[in-house]
Structures are given as C-alpha cells and as structure tokens.
Amino acid sequence: MELVAGCYEQVLFGFAVHPESEACGDHEQWTLVADFTHHAHTASLSAVAVNSRFVVTGSKDETIHIYDMKKKIEHGALVHHSGTITCLKFYGNRHLISGAEDGLICIWDAKKWECLKSIKAHKGQVTFLSIHPSGKLALSVGTDKTLRTWNLVEGRSAFIKNIKQNAHIVEWSPRGEQYVVIIQNKIDIYQLDTASISGTITNEKRISSVKFLSESVLAVAGDEEVIRFFDCDSLVCLCEFKAHENRVKDMFSFEIPEQHVIVTASSDGFIKMWKLEQDKKVPPSLLCEVNTKARLTCLGVWLDKVPDTKESFPPAAEPSPVSKEQSKIGKKEPGDTVYKEEKQSKPNTKKRNLAGDSKKATKESGLVSTKKRKMVEMLEKKRKKKKIKIMQ
C-alpha cells in the first residue's frame, strides 16, 4: 500500500504504508515511510488516479504522466489535451478517462496507452467526472452549467441536463443508486430511480472534496480545517472533527479486512490516515500522519489491487440499447432542460503513444523519454522568449 500526493511545487510524493499496529495503549497506530519524491511536471499537479499497476498524474502543463508503481519508474507521458488536466479516473485496469479545461473527455486504453476516443464534452471546461459502478455510464460537470450523462459502451453523449449553475464536483454512490452534484458549498442529492433532487445539504465553506463512506453517508471537506459526515437520507450532520490546521484539499477512502480508512491531504502539507468507526456518529481516530512541507493539491492510494469490475467500455463495435440507468437519469424534471444529444463530433481515431519507446518500458528507456521531453520543453520556452524580445 502506498500514498501518492501531488502539490503546487510540481512534485509527486510516495509514502509506503505499514498497517501493522504498534503498541500505543489502546490506540492503534500505523507507520508511513518515504518511498520517493519525483519532479513530475513543469507546472503544479492538478489530478491523480491509481489502478493496480500505474499511478497517473495530470497537471497545469497540459500533460498526463504515467508511473509504473511495481518497477518504480516513469512509464511515459500522454499528450492530447490543450488545457489543465482537471480530472482522471481509472475503470479497472483497462481504461483511463481524462477531462480538461479544453472541454474534452478522452478515453484511453491503459494497456497500449492509446487514445481510443476524444469527445468535445462541454462548451466550457470539464471540471469533474465520475464513473457509475457498472462502468456503463459516466457523469460530468463543466463551466457551461450542465450535467452530462455519457454512454461509455458506445462512447457518446446520452443526456444533457441544464443545472443553471456551474458545478465543480459530481460523485456516484457505491451502488450507483444516487449521486451528488456540488455547487460551491451546496450538495444536491439525486436519486437514480426518479432523476430528481431528493435533498440538499449546505456546508459552511466551499467544498473541495466529497467521498461516499457508504451508500448513505457522505464525507465532506472544504476550505476549512473541519471534515463532516452527512447522512444523505436525513440530511443531518452525523459528526464533524478537526482534521488539519488549514483547508482540506482532497480525500480518499478505502476498505481492507476489518478496516475502513479515510485519507486526507491539506494545504498545511500533512497527509493523514484515519480509522473510521462503524458508527459514523463517532469521529475517526488518527492512524498516522506525515508532513510533506508542500502545498498539496491531490491525493491517491495505490493498493496493488483493484476491485473486480466488468470492462464495459470503450466504444463497442455495435450500438447497444439505452440502459435502464440512462432512461432514469434522463427523465425531465420541472424547471430543468433535459434532452438527448443527437450530434456528436467525429471520434479521434489517431493513435497517440507514450512519449518515448512504444515497446515495453524499461528503466533506461523511461528515463530517456523523460529527458527528451524536458529538453523539448526548455527549447520551446527559449523560442518563446526570443519571439517576445524581437516583438519588443
């Protein structure tokens, strides 16, 4: 198990987790050991995603970098977007989905690292996306004030819902029976069977991250030191606790045998791991913490395994019928605009390989490809500076 975190300082941190409990009275305590620090990008990191083999990072430098966690080498880089990478999501070990400020959503083959589909998803920026547990649907939100549903089996848009405001987070529940849409400090809870808002929760500050701890309990972090657990059925706050000395930037939740853990990262530089109690009204207990001394932006946990998932996308050769989930989520709600999108831009069929050798990466080839990329970036910066001087 390994914690990975990105920061404004362009660095990716890796910390090995040792869950063996230490003797500390009745309090269980884990240990964190620094494994690596890697100068990953030429701008601040904005997103991270993990599967059983790779960690991928997105940045304001418009690139996605891939790291082989088993070999502990940089595997290469994906260059397709022309804006800050805002979100990265793996589905199983086979596919990666990326969203960016250029309005594109890209579906990548996580074996060959080819761009299988490039979709103009939003008229503005793509701010967040979430994949349904079935792998057949995805939701995305953007700066065009829409919530969009994607048929991942066919690789096309299914429905567009006008939500009248710019949302910055959308998240499915573990069973996919409901989802939340975050607008500033407001949480709208949608039920899949009715496609309507069943309730609204208001947080004190702007929300930066949410994670479902169960089908009905939602952890909420924002521009403050406190984390709150809300019941999505009763809409009440079950508990709140001070997690950090500064605003919480990201959270990650996972389960291992006899343990349910939530990990938090903050602008104060700390990454902390907390043990969740069965009764979510009881605040979690601190397992371990580490100070990176950096301004953290994003967080992931590499578990060396992923849950069993049925690979339902990328686009199939033949169109599939609209699923029950799509029919439900596409229901019209009074006061909202919901319609099925007819036109779709042509898919980008051009294959885009990793930077460097397309063969199986070795430690040497991975390093060479990284050096070449950095040299090109330096030359490009010098050319731009010369052009500015000539213009002056």
Predicted features along the sequence, with ranges:
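Terminal intrinsically disordered, low-complexity extensions flanking WD-repeat/beta-propeller proteins
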Residues: 1, 11, 20-23, 44, ...
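Structural hallmark of WD40 beta-propellers
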Residues: 1-4, 52-56, 65, 74-76, ...
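Beta-propeller domains
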Residues: 8-31, 60-62, 66-70
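Short coil/turn segments within WD40 beta-propeller repeats
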Residues: 9-13, 43-46, 61-65, 73, ...
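Short loop/turn segments that connect beta-strands within beta-propeller blades
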Residues: 18, 69-72, 110-113, 152-155, ...
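Short C-terminal beta-strands that terminate individual repeats in beta-propeller domains
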Residues: 25-28, 35-40, 74-80, 115-121, ...
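Loop/turn segments within WD40 beta-propeller blades
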Residues: 47-53, 71, 82, 88-94, ...
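Eukaryotic tandem repeat interaction scaffolds
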Residues: 153, 157-243
